[in-house]
Amino acid sequence: MTAVPPSCQILDGKALAQKMQGELQRDIAQLVAQGHRSPGLAVLMVGDNPASAVYVRNKEKACEKLGMVSFGKHFSADTDQETLTAAIASLNEDERVDGILVQLPLPDHLDAVKLLHTIDPSKDADGLHPVNLGHLVRGEEGLRSCTPAGVMALLAEYNLDLTGKNAVVLGRSILVGKPLALMLLEKNCTVTIAHSRTQNLADITRQADILVAAIGKPEFVTADMVKPGAIVVDVGINRLDLGEGKSTLVGDVDFAGVAPVASYLTPVPGGIGPMTVTLLLANTVASYRQRLGI
């Protein structure tokens, strides 16, 4: 990792994820010792996307480490919508399953939105069902979208006061940008969502006390776009080809350039990525507790 000046503190998502997973592991062990079953997470994967396969394996390993049961469902790339809908319906009824996740992206012939809508909202481990998003809009309790919730947990861990701060979110996806804007609003930030059609983007980002990049463009945010002393959160994960069969992971922020300007900065890897997986597990345990009334 690039050397970071003393004026910039790294927001260490990997360390917090390990801490939170340790707490979940102890929680689960205690509940199982009391005679309860282990929490169960079902992950549905369609096709053989290499990146998706890695993500699924990581989630299954994390489940095993925490004492959770993983119900992996792997379907061929030509599986039709009806088969997947039936599989989700079966998992909705399965009392061993507390969380259901459909690994994205799906093959083009499948309607991901319709599939996500068929998941029982109480088992929506990813927090993307319209019912759970509706709870977020209304400020009610519910399962939260994993990546935005991971961002908020990381900011909270460092006791960063968000009240009254100007927050700019780059990206308006339903996965990150929109729910994160709502979560920042809950913490009394003044929130701006910027996107590909935003004019005078750098003028807007330079007003941000908190700048979140979630657009999937490698090292898009440069030092001249950042307000001195800002909190910068990099949600992007982009693989850059270095040639000769080598590659590296970078975020949406030019880490080396922005570190001397920001007061807090998340690294890639080791920032928001580990938090996303951890919040997925936390959602599953929360669903498990609710379903068992414990």
Swiss-Prot record:
A single Gene Ontology CC term: cytosol
Pfam families: THF_DHG_CYH (PF00763), THF_DHG_CYH_C (PF02882)
Catalysed transformations (reactions): (6R)-5,10-methylene-5,6,7,8-tetrahydrofolate + NADP(+) = (6R)-5,10-methenyltetrahydrofolate + NADPH; (6R)-5,10-methenyltetrahydrofolate + H2O = (6R)-10-formyltetrahydrofolate + H(+)
Annotated positions binding NADP(+): G171, R172, S173, S196, I237
Family the UniProt entry places it in: Belongs to the tetrahydrofolate dehydrogenase/cyclohydrolase family.
Quaternary assembly: Homodimer.
Function: Catalyzes the oxidation of 5,10-methylenetetrahydrofolate to 5,10-methenyltetrahydrofolate and then the hydrolysis of 5,10-methenyltetrahydrofolate to 10-formyltetrahydrofolate.
Protein name as it appears in the record: Bifunctional protein FolD
Protein's organism: Synechocystis sp. (strain ATCC 27184 / PCC 6803 / Kazusa)
Lineage per the UniProt record: Bacteria, Bacillati, Cyanobacteriota, Cyanophyceae, Synechococcales
Gene: folD
